[in-house]
Amino acid sequence: MASEQEKTADFGFRTVAKDEKEVMVAEVFHSVAAKYDLMNDLMSFGIHRIWKRFTIECSGVRRNQRVLDLAGGTGDLTAKFSRMVGEGGEVILADINASMLKVGREKLRNKGIIDNINYVQANAEALPFPDDFFDCITISFGLRNVTDKNKALRSMYRVLKPGGRLLVLEFSKPVIKQLSTIYDAYSFHILPRIGEAVASDAGSYRYLAESIRMHPDQETLKGMMSDAGFDSVNYFNLTGGIVALHRGFKF
């Protein structure tokens, strides 16, 4: 029988049943989907665009390749990858949340980005793709919301081609003490107020702050990726470690 720890997961600072967490996370993103892009700009002062640009630069994606933008949400990375892979390539924007997927699809279609993109509602823990299928997988600000992160990493490894790479862009642990103090004050006191003012939803942004604190730190996530099978795993601290980009390869 599974232990109690195996049956539960963190939802922010709370411990809940795993199936309950999936429902609760879904409710958060159904709530914030319409204001997601605006809130990203406000919360990060636009810096999220620099973090994502760095992820693109580290991806090594080339023409005619197949890319999975997992937890791709409103499609920022998908839009860039679509141009990089060209007509002979393919980008799959996958997200477990139907509301986020809908916003992403409408956003990209309104920009005329259509031809080489497919949309799939998928759970990162059980990806509905063949083995050795993608040249590159990215998951941007999504892994911390996954219930079983180790299972998801193994699933990503399975569908990645030999020679392919995974990039995980995620909030992490600041490496400068003074920055950490300021960041905590901002996250727990200011961020929920912005969420209430802009999206009428302080609770979802309180969960965001808590989920960041519960997410594995840089070295722990590096070890988790290695345990899932990835080789040459390394990471880059961005903005003093507020965000980290982890990269691993499948050889």
UniProtKB/Swiss-Prot annotation:
<protein>
    <recommendedName>
        <fullName>Ubiquinone/menaquinone biosynthesis C-methyltransferase UbiE</fullName>
        <ecNumber>2.1.1.163</ecNumber>
        <ecNumber>2.1.1.201</ecNumber>
    </recommendedName>
</protein>
<feature type="binding site">
    <location>
        <begin position="123"/>
        <end position="124"/>
    </location>
    <ligand>
        <name>S-adenosyl-L-methionine</name>
    </ligand>
</feature>
<keyword id="KW-0949">S-adenosyl-L-methionine</keyword>
<dbReference type="InterPro" id="IPR004033">
    <property type="entry name" value="UbiE/COQ5_MeTrFase"/>
</dbReference>
<dbReference type="GO" id="GO:0008425">
    <property type="term" value="F:2-methoxy-6-polyprenyl-1,4-benzoquinol methyltransferase activity"/>
</dbReference>
<keyword id="KW-0489">Methyltransferase</keyword>
<feature type="binding site">
    <location>
        <position position="140"/>
    </location>
    <ligand>
        <name>S-adenosyl-L-methionine</name>
    </ligand>
</feature>
<keyword id="KW-0474">Menaquinone biosynthesis</keyword>
<feature type="binding site">
    <location>
        <position position="74"/>
    </location>
    <ligand>
        <name>S-adenosyl-L-methionine</name>
    </ligand>
</feature>
<keyword id="KW-0831">Ubiquinone biosynthesis</keyword>
<comment type="pathway">
    <text>Quinol/quinone metabolism; menaquinone biosynthesis; menaquinol from 1,4-dihydroxy-2-naphthoate: step 2/2.</text>
</comment>
<comment type="pathway">
    <text>Cofactor biosynthesis; ubiquinone biosynthesis.</text>
</comment>
<dbReference type="InterPro" id="IPR023576">
    <property type="entry name" value="UbiE/COQ5_MeTrFase_CS"/>
</dbReference>
<keyword id="KW-0808">Transferase</keyword>
<dbReference type="GO" id="GO:0032259">
    <property type="term" value="P:methylation"/>
</dbReference>
<comment type="similarity">
    <text>Belongs to the class I-like SAM-binding methyltransferase superfamily. MenG/UbiE family.</text>
</comment>
<dbReference type="GO" id="GO:0009060">
    <property type="term" value="P:aerobic respiration"/>
</dbReference>
<comment type="function">
    <text>Methyltransferase required for the conversion of demethylmenaquinol (DMKH2) to menaquinol (MKH2) and the conversion of 2-polyprenyl-6-methoxy-1,4-benzoquinol (DDMQH2) to 2-polyprenyl-3-methyl-6-methoxy-1,4-benzoquinol (DMQH2).</text>
</comment>
<dbReference type="GO" id="GO:0009234">
    <property type="term" value="P:menaquinone biosynthetic process"/>
</dbReference>
<dbReference type="Pfam" id="PF01209">
    <property type="entry name" value="Ubie_methyltran"/>
</dbReference>
<feature type="binding site">
    <location>
        <position position="95"/>
    </location>
    <ligand>
        <name>S-adenosyl-L-methionine</name>
    </ligand>
</feature>
<dbReference type="GO" id="GO:0043770">
    <property type="term" value="F:demethylmenaquinone methyltransferase activity"/>
</dbReference>
<dbReference type="InterPro" id="IPR029063">
    <property type="entry name" value="SAM-dependent_MTases_sf"/>
</dbReference>
